[in-house]
Amino acid sequence: MTAEGPLAPEDRVLDREAIGRLCVSLIAAEQQDLLREGRVGHHQMIGARLLTAGHPSPDDLLIDEDTLGLDSLLMLSLVTRVAGFFHLSDSNTEDYLLVRRRLGEWVDLIDHHHTLMGPKARFTFATSGSTAGPKPVTHSAAALLSEGQAIAKILTERPPEVRRVLSCVPAHHIYGFLWSCLFPSRRGLEAKQLANLSASGIMRHARSGDLVVGTPFIWEQFADLDYRLPGDVVGVTSGAPSTAETWRCASALGPARMLDIYGSTETGGIGWRERRDDPFRTLPDLACFHDTLSRLGRRLDLQDEIAWDKDGGFTILGRKDEILQVAGSNVSPAAVRDILLRNPRVRDAAVRLDGRRLKAVISVAEGADEAEIEIELRATAARHLPAPARPDRFLFATELPRTGAGKLADW
């Protein structure tokens, strides 16, 4: 299972700095789950710890109960997450995470794992399932490196030259991994993780030669800023479908190039474009035969229906399933509806997308206290649903709105 002989630095999938960013991102994700359950405090979050105590070196950060609020059982859960992401069991190194308690020691251990595994390394990402639950998806280092080369080709085919990466998305998501970890590692570029900063804070970091990695939701957060990017900045958006508002907000910032990437956790990147009205072009590393796409011989099953044009470009027609994307997360309207129907005073409910958030229409008995029911529903949603899956707007009616044909109508 391991590579033959030591690897040269240029043959490794990730550099040490990228491994560190991934570890921080995985720890933060584990803590976010615990924070929602009230088991850790905001002051114990790894992001806060790295910004306090005189700005200690990240390598010296202790991964323990006193520092990050992780007791022995919570440590087991974290170790399982980190070991599973990097597939440390392939090199029999996963148990060392339990005895090494500094962030730098974890990074060194994972770096050693990659030295042993080489191109046989594997990574497991989780889909952004907000309601149905995340699903693990494993990708080989070879496939990820192939896509990384495709990204580099797209970015270097014309100016400006990218000299640094600013990422506004979590590093352990496949989009963040490819663009803010693998790509800069392979090109020898500096990368900064800014996912926890405000929109204005992100913009203050930008300088000429940067690649800014965001989602449509993030780019639209810049709309209210009276700000223009420095010259020669490239923007990229993915994680959810871009809209006219996404492109308007991004264009107002004045990037030299703006890339829209289509793909998923299951497939990796599939297509890209630089203008909203253009069709997507397939990434350079993909093979297409009879409208079937593959990467390194592995067929890629798309979650959307697409239409091909005569020049080999494609347009996305819509999802094959009933999943919506909200702020970069997959949301099942049916699952949200089931949560709302737990209230005994709700006779029926319907949920759909309303701009960037969800809206719900609630059927209640005539004369029911709608304000009181809305308070109850918002409390239920807060307890049982992550933020992207919580309806932002409620409308009440005695019957759900329907068309003359009996189909559910918009409201």
Curated annotation (Swiss-Prot):
It holds the Pfam family AMP-binding. GO terms for molecular function: 4-coumarate-CoA ligase activity; ATP binding. Its EC number is 6.2.1.12. It comes from the Bacteria. Keywords: ATP-binding, Ligase, Nucleotide-binding, Phenylpropanoid metabolism. It comes from Cereibacter sphaeroides (strain ATCC 17023 / DSM 158 / JCM 6121 / CCUG 31486 / LMG 2827 / NBRC 12203 / NCIMB 8253 / ATH 2.4.1.). GO terms for biological process: phenylpropanoid metabolic process. The keyword Nucleotide-binding applies. The gene is pcl. SUPFAM superfamilies: Acetyl-CoA synthetase-like. It catalyses: (E)-4-coumarate + ATP + CoA = (E)-4-coumaroyl-CoA + AMP + diphosphate. InterPro entries: 4_coum_CoA_lig, AMP-bd_C, AMP-bd_C_sf, AMP-dep_synth/lig_dom, ANL_N_sf, ATP-dep_AMP-bd_enzyme. Belongs to the ATP-dependent AMP-binding enzyme family. NCBIfam families: 4_coum_CoA_lig. It is an enzyme of class 6 (ligase). This is 4-coumarate--CoA ligase. Converts p-coumaric acid into p-coumaryl CoA. This is necessary for the activation of the photoactive yellow protein (PYP) chromophore.
